[in-house]
Amino acid sequence: MFMDFAMLPPEVNSTRMYSGPGAGSLWAAAAAWDQVSAELQSAAETYRSVIASLTGWQWLGPSSVRMGAAVTPYVEWLTTTAAQARQTATQITAAATGFEQAFAMTVPPPAIMANRAQVLSLIATNFFGQNTAAIAALETQYAEMWEQDATAMYDYAATSAAARTLTPFTSPQQDTNSAGLPAQSAEVSRATANAGAADGNWLGNLLEEIGILLLPIAPELTPFFLEAGEIVNAIPFPSIVGDEFCLLDGLLAWYATIGSINNINSMGTGIIGAEKNLGILPELGSAAAAAAPPPADIAPAFLAPLTSMAKSLSDGALRGPGEVSAAMRGAGTIGQMSVPPAWKAPAVTTVRAFDATPMTTLPGGDAPAAGVPGLPGMPASGAGRAGVVPRYGVRLTVMTRPLSGG
């Protein structure tokens, strides 16, 4: 409601403008509303970012979709309220600006009082009309002050009226269901009672997963698949997946058994290979005895245990009871080739030592047979090469003639 500021003298309008609290409170209110708007907008953006991160990557499922649908209205309310708070701050800023403009246009009260004092003084001394022109000029100035104050007040009133036009604030709607806790308890009880038949809900779960996967590319199809999944889950399907998994468990157990048998077979193969390698011990013992005969007093005591142990190992001492026995190493050998026992091994050529030279007096001797039976090409340990290295001539020492000899 506008007042008729033109009917009020400038003393009243100027006094009102200069006696008020000023625009300081308006500027403080505008800053406060602007801060409220920024906080609401930040909260809305944070909500939106967190929900997008949860429902898009980390949290998938019907609960995620329902949570997003429930919290979306609240995020929209935050955004709308932030815009309204920003509008309020803008309007208050406009009102403060209008006040400062009106204050600048208003005539200061001391100037009005000085004008009135001069007029009264001139009227008091105007005996012969000599002050009439001066009084008229002061009255004209006073009328201009009146008009100026009235204009300032009208402009300020219009600005304040526009600033008071605001959109009403609304409260956020309730985004929770009061019947949620009882429904959750009932659902938990039903799931516990039907835990044995949970395998029949695979089709409903599949439909719900399809609906969730379609959310980024076709959100309009998501509600259809979610509702279809809930309907299918409500149907009491028989438990058919359990039998299939029992069959798979049996196949896996059979595969594990076959693997164990293969491991046992590999172990037996390793033992047989070790037995074959141990069969060479008697030949090594015989070759060692032939290459370097030990003294007669210790030869039987030393070689008998070694030969007996090698013989027992090579004849199958490692075989367990109840196994199939087989004879090994019955064939003869010529070089690296196995031959029938009737074949005769070629005679081993004897390598003689170097013949004695006229420069030596030690006679030569026959060298022992080279090689180990069963391992051709392997030199026997201690195969001697008897004889002394021949000497060809004697190095002579020549002495020079001493100086004292003359």
Swiss-Prot record:
One of its GO terms (biological process) is response to host immune response. InterPro entries: PPE_C (IPR022171), PPE_dom (IPR000030), PPE_sf (IPR038332). Pfam families: PPE, PPE-SVP. PANTHER family: GLUTAMINE-RICH PROTEIN 2. Belongs to the mycobacterial PPE family. This is Uncharacterized PPE family protein PPE61.
